[in-house]
Curated annotation (Swiss-Prot):
Name by which UniProt lists this protein: Chorismate synthase
Keywords from the named record: Amino-acid biosynthesis, Aromatic amino acid biosynthesis, FAD, Flavoprotein, FMN, Lyase, NADP
Record's subunit section: Homotetramer.
Enzyme class at the top of the EC tree: lyase
Cofactor annotation comment: Reduced FMN (FMNH(2)).
Residue numbers binding FMN: R125, S126, S127, N238, A239, G278, K293, P294, T295, S296, S297, R319
Pathway where it operates: Metabolic intermediate biosynthesis; chorismate biosynthesis; chorismate from D-erythrose 4-phosphate and phosphoenolpyruvate: step 7/7
The protein's required cofactors: FMNH2
GO molecular function, one term: chorismate synthase activity
Catalyses which reaction(s): 5-O-(1-carboxyvinyl)-3-phosphoshikimate = chorismate + phosphate
Listed Pfam families: Chorismate_synt
PROSITE patterns from the UniProt entry: CHORISMATE_SYNTHASE_1 (PS00787), CHORISMATE_SYNTHASE_2 (PS00788), CHORISMATE_SYNTHASE_3 (PS00789)
The organism's taxonomic lineage, starting at the top: Bacteria, Pseudomonadati, Pseudomonadota, Gammaproteobacteria, Enterobacterales
Length: 361
């Protein structure tokens, strides 16, 4: 089956292309009675949308969301929620030069080989434009998680190129265009972006997402473990080439005596596991990291082929992000929220009556 949906109890199906008429999604499984407005959803969409700073693509989409169904008098009805965002700033002529050429590092070649046809305008369905609907659906999940369980899902830029950012100030994340929590790194990040723009090149990034106050018990061993579903969801984001849960690949150099999260009557003493043990949430913060590749849509000439298999030189023109990782923060938050909400509903369905005498913190 086509891979346009995610989730079992909280199910999100998206549709639309980069230069199509509109983007949309259908959300099934939303409990009734949740207060939700277009303004609630718009808050996260505005964090993701293009053209909001000089560091991102200058495609200027308002990304104004419309609720088509599933909400009446300001609350969810329990029926399918339909959301739509119209595309308003397409410049398809920017892509006419690549109609018969395959951009290296993009999905052009693989989409052509899989489907026998491709929408070359901005990448069509493979464009990160599609993620606007994930953010919209994630905004609903985030509101439910916060209202019902006090769960807070937040993300930040952990690294761009050689510039690493320490988590020093959550409030600062929303006060700069990089989603950076480290004030001392704002100037180096700005310098790096100016250098990239001048060179017509791009850079990769690392994003960290943290969910706090996640209840114990979420996750369905063995194939739908919470970390497995999180990895699946986060890996589905455009340009993501790696996912880590907790300490991730750093555990390779650790010994069991230092990596285990020891438990005392006061609680866990560390969180190397990233809040997930045996595929089930432990009650600690759920922590995930994603690595995003540098976009291949750059002004630096490169080698590729055309439809006839002939060697050609390519320079990608148009409006593109020097670092796609900047706008990935709200997208990663949305995907974590979608997975957590799905698993909360699944846990309630099967194990909602389970009570344990073992302490939880």
């Amino acid at each position: 089956m086509a891979g346009n949906s995610i989730g079992q109890f909280f199910r999100v199906t998206t549709f639309g292309e980069s230069h199509g008429i509109a983007l949309g999604c259908i959300i099934d499984g939303v409990p009734p009675g949740i207060p939700i407005t277009e303004a609630d959803i718009q808050l996260d969409l505005d964090r993701r949308r293009p053209g909001t700073s000089r560091y991102t693509t200058q495609r200027r989409e308002l990304d104004q969301v419309r609720i088509l169904s599933g909400v009446f008098e300001g609350v969810t009805t329990g029926t399918s929620i339909g959301l739509m965002i119209e595309n308003t700033d397409q410049r398809s002529q920017d892509y006419s030069a690549i109609k018969d050429v395959f951009r290296p590092g993009h999905a052009d070649y693989t989409y052509e080989q899989k489907y026998g046809v491709r929408d070359y305008r901005g990448g069509g369905r493979s464009s990160a434009r599609e993620t606007a609907m994930r953010v919209a659906a994630g905004a609903i999940a985030k509101k439910y998680l916060a209202q019902k369980f006090g769960v807070q899902v937040r993300g930040y830029l952990a690294q761009m190129g050689d510039v690493s950012c320490d988590l020093l100030d959550w409030d600062l994340v929303e006060q700069n265009p990089f989603f950076c929590p480290d004030a001392s790194k704002l100037e180096p990040l700005d310098a790096l972006m100016r250098e990239l723009k001048k060179a017509g090149d791009s850079i990769g990034a690392k994003i960290t997402v943290v969910a706090e106050n996640v209840p114990v018990g979420l996750g369905e061993p063995v194939f739908d473990r919470l970390d497995a579903d999180l990895a699946h969801a986060l890996m589905s984001i455009n340009a993501v080439k790696g996912v880590e849960i907790g300490d991730g690949f750093a555990v390779v150099t650790k010994r069991g005596s230092e990596n285990r999260d020891e438990i005392t009557p006061q609680g866990f003493q560390s969180n190397h596991a990233g809040g997930i043990l045996g595929g089930i949430s432990s009650g600690q913060p759920v922590v995930a990291h994603i690595a995003l590749k540098p976009t291949s849509s750059i002004m630096v000439p490169g080698q590729t082929i055309n439809r006839q298999g002939e060697a050609v030189e390519i320079v990608t023109r148009g409006r593109h992000d020097p670092c796609v990782g900047i706008r990935a923060v709200p997208i990663a938050e949305a995907m974590m929220a979608i997975v957590l909400m799905d698993h909360l509903l699944r846990q309630r369905a099967q194990c909602g009556d389970v009570a344990s005498d073992v302490p939880r913190w």
